[in-house]
Each structure stands twice: as structure tokens, then as C-alpha cells.
Amino acid sequence: MAKELKELTPRSESYSQWYQDLVIKADLAENSAVRGCMVIKPYGYAIWEKMQRQLDDMFKETGHVNAYFPLFIPKSFLSREAEHVEGFAKECAVVTHYRLKANPDGDGVVVDPQAKLEEELIVRPTSETIIWNTYKNWIQSHRDLPILCNQWANVVRWEMRTRLFLRTAEFLWQEGHTAHATKEEAEEEARRMLEVYATFAEEYMAMPVVKGVKSANERFAGAVDTYTIEALMQDGKALQSGTSHFLGQNFAKAFNVTFADKDGNRDFVWATSWGVSTRLMGALIMSHSDDNGLVLPPKLAPYQVVIIPIYRNEEQLAQIDEKATQITQALRAKGISVKYDNSDNKKPGWKFAEYELKGIPVRLAMGARDLENNTIEIARRDTLTKETVGLDGIEETVATLLDDIQKNIFQKALNYRKEHTITVDSYEEFKEKIEDGGFILAHWDGTSETEERIKAETKATIRCIPLNGDMTPGKCMVTGKPSPQRVLFARAY
């Protein structure tokens, strides 16, 4: 049964199917009755809650507060920012009526034709328009600035080709929307939030990222600049994991949001927006997991430790229960989250397989011999190694091990990225190497035409213009025209 529980398609056989198998079998999420929408199951949601809690703390540490804005946006609002509406028009879900009625045929319900809305409503794909319409009422003077708001919400972008967590019609996210008196302050905010995302990705998700700026083609609709963090998955594809946008005065002008400065002169407000979504769940799964199941960084695991008793009779179980309770209390006193699984409906072998599949970082197993010797077996999920250790100071042993696992998972992902990042100078070499996956650093002439040609011919996109990259100028690999620095290419999710 334990083998059946864990039967995942190997990554080498089909990475896509492995991912799908893992999300389902590890009880993270499943498809719903609504096409393109997912059910996030309790175990998956527990991971998302840990992400949410940590990010929320980081937002508040940088001066942000939470608010909530409507799910529905009047269609006319989207029309006010031309680039913005063009970017989202094909993905919008539209509400046209406000009532149902009983079917005259007696079969279920139908839309009441008398209940047509005067103005159609858009189910939010993102909230810039509704928020800036609101900010107009909040901002009169420089004393009202800055506004530093974040919203935790769901959004809808009608996707035809969906994958659990990575691309769904409805997803959960946070979106920050800030208003500032100066361009410099807004630009600083956009960069600050990029740093917050990068810190979260690397220190909590144990996922190395490249920080950069998007090209004009890849920029958020309505933004002046889009900053991004890009991660490399185990199949050699990039995953955009968070974005922060400097919006200039575009939305302030669209909604006529002005303020009086210290001299009484009126000017348009400067803006940013920034967000991450449940897509991070997909990034977390694909960054670290293996053919045995999830590998979770301890900082985001719902439980960091699971304790499993191994016993022959009720007397042994009672003795192990007593000792396990002491261990659990000692670990929790150190801030370590623990689950003691003494359920009698599954054998230890099944439990080992289940918690390995679910990526619990540390497994402790205790049997009768351990009771006699004052020892316990300790197994780590990241390396699948185990050893028997003394119980004295077990909380220190586990705390040190969790810290080591967090660092090891990050280092492993970093090593993978280093091994799969190359530099090329010729377009012929680029076309050959892109088939192997990974990041490619190459010179580009800065034009949309060249970027579109590369995408059409190779399916690779410019993931970002790295902020801390190789600033040596050169010649575009396609046209030979001057290039100020290398940019990061990859095929992407």
C-alpha cells in the first residue's frame, strides 16, 4: 500500500505529469466542477497560510496596511487606461445580469432577461482601476501621501489551458497599491517591494531568484517599469515568481487623482503596484521536490517534524506516548511545529511513505529499543538519510537539523541554477543551447522586433534585464547592433 501511495510518474519520464501527480497525491489541490478553477485542499492551504503570514509580516514591517476593495469593477473603469485594458481584455469575466428566475418549463433556473445590468461589471483581473477610483476620494493634499495599501484577495483571469497552482482561472494573491508625492519615492517603493519578494523567495522558500527589469514587451499593462524575480525550475524552465511595477502617473491621470504640494501647486500622484500569487506554490513544489514526493523548506512546512511510534502492543504504545509527549513539548517550546501520529489505522511503513510524500522535513521514529536506550531515529527528507541519536538535547539536535535542511535545499537549488546558466554570443549557439533548457545570458539590441523574432523562432523570452548582471557592453547576437548588457533568456511557464 505504501508503494501505491507514492507512485509518481518519474520526472525524467514526464516532468509535467510528475507535477500533476504530486499536487494530487500530496493532497495539495485538485480540479473543481468549474473548468479552470481549483480546490486548494487543507494541506496545500496550510502551506499558503505560512507564506501569507510571513509576507504579511514583511509588508507591515515596511509600513504597509491591509484593506479590501470590491470584487466587481465597472466596465468603464477598465476603458480609462488604454494599455491596461488591452493587456487584460481577453481574460476578463463579465457579469451582465443580477438575477435568476425559475425556468418557465419547470426545469431549473434561467437568467432573468429583465435583470440586465445598466453597466456590465468585470470580475477583477487586478484592482488598479477600482483602487485608483477610490484613492481619488482619499487624496487632496501632500499630507494624505503616501498611501501604502495591500489587499489579500482572489482574482479571475479566464485561462483556457490551466495547470494547478501555475495557471488557473481563479487564483489567490496579494496586490499592493501605493500612492506617492514624487517619482523618486514611487520608484524606491517599487524596488523596495522587489527586495521583499526576493528575500522571501530565498530565505523562506529556499528558492534562488534573479532580480531584474522586464523588457517593454513583457512589461505589465499600464506600467512604466516592471521589476521581477525569476526562478529556474528543475525542468530548465523559468517561472516568474513576483512582480513590482512603477506605474508613473498613468493611473492617476486616468482617474484624475491629484494632490496639492507644499506650495499649493497641484500635480498627479505617482503610483506602484506589486503582487505574488498562489503561483508561488507551484514554484515551491517544482524547485525542490523529487520522485519520492514533496521536499519542503522547514520555514514553510505545515509541520516541521512528525513523530511516529513503532510498537507491538498497547503497553509499548503507552510508554512511547509518554516519551513522545515530552519530546513534543520540548520541540514546541523551541518554536518547532510537531505532529505526533499515534493513529492505529495505518502501519508505520505507510506513515513513513505518506510523510515522505508530503515533504515533512524531519521524521522521528521511536520503538521499544529506543525507550530502553534513550534514543530515537531521526530522518531528514531532503537527503533521505537517517541516524539514531540520543534523546538528551533532542530539541537542539532537531533545531540545528532544520536549519541545515533549509540551507541545504537552497544550496542545491542554487547549484542547479549555476549549472544551468550559460553565456552565448552567437544566435546559432543560442538556438542550439535553448533546447537544453536553463538560463541563457546573451546580448540583445533592445528592440521589440528582435525580441519577437527570438520568441517566434525559439519559444524563448527575455525573462529580465538583470539588475546585478554582467554590465559589459557587446553586440546583439541576432542583429550585431550595440547592446549595453547581457539579458536573461529562457523558456518559461
Swiss-Prot record:
It holds the Pfam family ProRS-C_1. Keywords: Aminoacyl-tRNA synthetase, ATP-binding, Cytoplasm, Ligase, Nucleotide-binding, Protein biosynthesis. GO terms for molecular function: ATP binding; proline-tRNA ligase activity. It comes from the Bacteria. PROSITE patterns: AA_TRNA_LIGASE_II (PS50862). SMART domains: ProRS-C_1. It is found in: Cytoplasm. Its main location: cytoplasm. InterPro entries: aa-tRNA-synt_IIb (IPR002314), aa-tRNA-synth_II (IPR006195), aa-tRNA-synth_II/BPL/LPL (IPR045864), Anticodon-bd (IPR004154), Anticodon-bd_dom_sf (IPR036621), Pro-tRNA-ligase_IIa_arc-type (IPR004499), Pro-tRNA_ligase_II_C (IPR016061), Pro-tRNA_synth_II (IPR017449). Its EC number is 6.1.1.15. One of its GO terms (biological process) is prolyl-tRNA aminoacylation. It catalyses: tRNA(Pro) + L-proline + ATP = L-prolyl-tRNA(Pro) + AMP + diphosphate. GO terms for cellular component: aminoacyl-tRNA synthetase multienzyme complex; cytoplasm. The keyword Nucleotide-binding applies. SUPFAM superfamilies: C-terminal domain of ProRS, Class II aaRS ABD-related, Class II aaRS and biotin synthetases. Consists of three domains: the N-terminal catalytic domain, the anticodon-binding domain and the C-terminal extension. Belongs to the class-II aminoacyl-tRNA synthetase family. ProS type 3 subfamily. Catalyzes the attachment of proline to tRNA(Pro) in a two-step reaction: proline is first activated by ATP to form Pro-AMP and then transferred to the acceptor end of tRNA(Pro). Homodimer. This is Proline--tRNA ligase. The gene is proS.
